[in-house]
């Protein structure tokens, strides 16, 4: 499973670890992803989404039906 938020599209980015001597070694910054079940009242069922913490805040703000409508227009499976 790819490390991509289904709501916000957040994905891993690359950067550097920096030691005290400012030596750089490559690293990845991973999104804070969770598999979470959301109850969809209109469909009377649970939907499991892989969302970041910010994605959960977006769902709290907009509502799950609105977010699922956006996913459908993008052609994403859920």
Curated annotation (Swiss-Prot):
It holds the Pfam family Ribosomal_L28. One of its GO terms (cellular component) is cytosolic large ribosomal subunit. It comes from the Bacteria. One of its GO terms (biological process) is translation. The keyword NAD does not apply. InterPro entries: Ribosomal_bL28, Ribosomal_bL28/bL31-like_sf, Ribosomal_bL28_bact-type, Ribosomal_bL28_sf. SUPFAM superfamilies: L28p-like. Residues 1-21 are annotated as: Disordered. GO terms for molecular function: structural constituent of ribosome. Signal peptide: none annotated. The keyword Transcription does not apply. Keywords: Ribonucleoprotein, Ribosomal protein. Belongs to the bacterial ribosomal protein bL28 family. HAMAP family: Ribosomal_bL28. NCBIfam families: L28. This is Large ribosomal subunit protein bL28. It comes from Serratia proteamaculans (strain 568).
């Amino acid at each position: 499973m790819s490390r991509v938020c289904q709501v916000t599209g957040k994905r891993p980015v690359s950067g550097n670890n920096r030691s005290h001597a400012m030596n750089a070694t490559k690293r990845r910054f991973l999104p804070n992803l969770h598999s979470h079940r959301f109850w969809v009242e209109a469909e009377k069922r649970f939907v499991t989404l892989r969302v970041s913490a910010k994605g959960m805040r977006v769902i709290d703000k907009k509502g799950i039906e609105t977010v699922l409508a956006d996913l459908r227009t993008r052609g994403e499976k859920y």
